């Protein structure tokens, strides 16, 4: 999604339009998935409101931050920062949930920090890179981590809301927040953001399906692989503008390894 969104933003750098069009398209994809799931699992709309509220955090506020970050700092580096979400998730658990610390968790945290250091030590950076965009990306990753824990908490409870319906509710809440923030019509320019929106919608539904079936400690590290995928696709499709170097690749690998270590031993 990040690479497709970067390609669209290169053509039209309007962040408000891009965020609204991407979230709106993702909502349509989720609605189609929910419609396909309904005959077998039902709707249970009256119980979906907690997911609507979760959507205000992510994709709502998070998607605004991520779109700004991708415009200002590029897809590859933002994807790399998003890979730190497992570290944020564990930090939340240690500080607020009193989960015990362990050597593997500390080692995973060190690997993720080392990946961030590699990113900071880059010598050849694109001219358009804005470090503030990386801060936006980390804020988005923090909201992702909060979202992941909330969704898993809701899914592990007694909810009867199907995954696709839950994802639709979250995307609806997020899209409404984005629409209030953007305060503008989509117009005809939204078409260039459709590929990013389709990928976003498909990934969001898949994410909810995963959290309904597995723990955060298993799913979150798998999602962190996005760092490597994002860097790889950026090198393939955005080679001239992204300037993918050795340090960026090493940093992405360290972050994914750290996230995996945290997930396995948490």
Where are each of the predicted segments found?
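Membrane-interface interhelical linkers
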Residues: 2-53, 63-73, 121-136, 157, ...
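Residues that mark transmembrane-helix kinks and helix-interface sites
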Residues: 2-3, 59-66, 90, 113, ...
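Juxtamembrane helix-start motifs in multi-pass secondary transporters
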Residues: 17-19, 78, 163-167, 219, ...
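Alpha-helical transmembrane segments of compact multi-pass small-molecule transporters, enriched
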Residues: 25-32, 81-96, 110, 169, ...
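Hydrophobic alpha-helical transmembrane segments in multi-pass integral membrane proteins
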Residues: 29-40, 88-105, 141-157, 200-217, ...
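Structural signature of hydrophobic alpha-helical transmembrane segments
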Residues: 42-59, 97-113, 156-174, 212-227
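Residue-level signature of transmembrane alpha-helical cores of multipass secondary-active transporters
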Residues: 51-55, 67, 79, 109, ...
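Juxtamembrane helix-loop boundary signature in multi-pass membrane transporters
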Residues: 84-142, 153, 231, 235-236, ...
């Amino acid at each position: 999604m990040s690479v497709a969104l970067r390609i669209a933003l290169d053509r039209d750098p309007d962040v408000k339009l891009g965020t609204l069009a991407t979230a709106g398209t993702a909502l349509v994809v989720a609605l189609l998935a929910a419609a396909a799931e309904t005959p077998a699992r039902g709707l249970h709309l009256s119980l979906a409101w907690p997911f609507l509220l979760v959507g205000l955090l992510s994709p709502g506020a998070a998607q605004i931050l991520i779109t700004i970050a991708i415009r200002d700092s590029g897809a590859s580096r933002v994807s790399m920062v998003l890979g730190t979400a497992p570290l944020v998730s564990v930090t939340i658990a240690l500080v607020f949930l009193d989960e015990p610390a362990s050597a593997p968790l500390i080692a995973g945290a060190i690997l993720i920090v080392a990946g961030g250091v590699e990113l900071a030590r880059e010598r050849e950076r694109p001219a358009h890179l804005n470090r503030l965009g990386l801060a936006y990306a980390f804020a988005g990753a923090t909201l992702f981590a909060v979202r992941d824990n909330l969704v898993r908490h809701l899914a592990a409870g007694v909810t009867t809301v199907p995954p696709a319906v839950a994802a639709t509710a979250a995307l609806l809440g997020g899209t409404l927040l984005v629409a209030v923030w953007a305060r503008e019509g989509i117009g005809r320019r939204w078409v260039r953001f459709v590929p990013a929106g389709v990928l976003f919608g498909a990934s969001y539904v898949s994410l909810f399906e995963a959290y309904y079936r597995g723990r955060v400690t298993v799913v979150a590290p798998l999602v962190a692989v996005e760092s490597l995928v994002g860097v790889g696709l950026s090198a393939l499709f955005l080679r001239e503008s992204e300037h993918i170097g050795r340090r960026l690749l090493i940093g992405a690998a360290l972050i994914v390894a750290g996230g995996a270590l945290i997930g396995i031993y948490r």
